[in-house]
Every structure is written in C-alpha cells, then in structure tokens.
Amino acid sequence: MLIYEYQSTDWRITMKAYERLLKYVTFRTPSDENSENTPSSACQFELARFLKNEMEGLNLSDIVLDDMCYLYGKLPATKGYENVPAIGFIAHMDTVSDYCNHDITPVITENFNGVSLKLPAGITLSVHEFPHLGTLKERTLITSDGSTILGADDKAGIAEILTMIEHLQKGNIPHGTICIAFTPDEEIGMGAEHFNIEQFGAKYAYTIDGDTEGEIQYENFNA
C-alpha cells in the first residue's frame, strides 16, 4: 500500500489517467447547496484555472473559462475529418459537501487480494459488504485513507477526458472535432443550469461520470 503525496513540481503534460486523478484530488472543490451563487463555492475556480492551464498545454483551441466556472475547449478535427459531427465529453469539478472533503490523502493498493481492503484510518472494506470488490482482484485500487472522500466523482472523469485527448494527439489517431466541458455544481443538481451549448459546440456528447466499466447510461437529468 502506497500513500500518495502530491508534489507541485511533478506537473507535466505526459500523464496516465490515474496520475492526473491523483493531482486533481488535491484540490478541495465541494459544492454548497445553501449558496445562491454560481459556482456555489469559489474553490471550484481553483481547479478550473488549473485545468485551463493544462488544456492550454495540450494546445486545445477555443478554451473559455466563463464567470460561472464552466470551462470549455476543443481538439480540432484531423485533416479529412473536418465534416464529421463533433462529439463532446463532459465531467464535473465539484464534489459532495456532506462528507469530509479536505486534507485528502490518496492511497494506492497494488495487486488487490479481492477479499478485503484495510485503509490507514482503520476502516476495512470487505467483499461481503461490497461484492463488486471481488471483480477487482489483482488490480490496482485508488482510495482515500478512509477518513475522507477521494473525489473521484468526478475528477476521475476529468482525468479520463484529458488523457484521451493526449492519446488522440500523440497516437496520430484520426478524429472529428472533440469538444470538452468541465462544469461546477453537479452534486447539488445545478451542473447544467448555465451550460452554454453553443460554446460547447458538440452535436452529440457523453457525460463521463459512471460506475461499472463498460456501462453507458443514455440519458440523465442534470449532469
């Protein structure tokens, strides 16, 4: 078991999805259901600005961070694919506010035994309580230390989207225009409230905020 400590000097563009996740969860971004502002918590802007810089480093186009903390950008189509319908990918930056959401310490468990997972805070997760754990035998798991949330909902989605962008670029994979958007306040049901569809620019889009690998939900009400 490894306890991850983020170092601000280890920022770089070439990253795997889990490395990006470990970076993003160091940002505290709980939304606030009692707020009348958008975003409901100013701290969400800190992550948004960081992501904007990363998107600029990936040479995305049409990058816009608006005054309500919606962040948009595009990966232009490769030559010959300019007329392919644009596809979009969306994830949210906020986390839940009703659990401990600060001083998050990611823990990496390699080669999981498939039976039980003991976290540093003294909590044990067992396959009897959480049967899905049995399907993760011999895989690498990323959790919190058990005293806080991790924030993978939905920072894992953000990490997956930007890693996909980098993979498309460096793999020289042909594609149409890829539109991405990172939104605030999804956890309090307001994520789509001020979403700028025209700025986003996609013909079709997926929200990367799921559960089981390979699962697709073809509609949602506020994400």
Residue spans of the language-model regions?
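Acidic/histidine-rich catalytic neighborhood of metal-dependent amide-processing enzymes
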Residues: G134-A223
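Intrinsically disordered, low-complexity regions
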Residues: W11-I13, K74, V115, I123, ...
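Short, Lys/Arg-enriched N-terminal segments with co-localized hydrophobic residues
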Residues: M1-T14
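Acidic/His- and Gly-rich active-site-bordering loop/insert found
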Residues: M15-T140
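Active-site-proximal helix/loop capping residues that flank conserved catalytic or ligand/cofactor
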Residues: M1, E19-L22, N53, A159, ...
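Intrinsically disordered, low-complexity regions enriched for glutamine and histidine
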Residues: Y4-E5, A42, E46, I90, ...
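Generic structural signal for short, solvent-exposed loop/turn connectors between secondary structure elements
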Residues: I13-K16, G57, M68, I173, ...
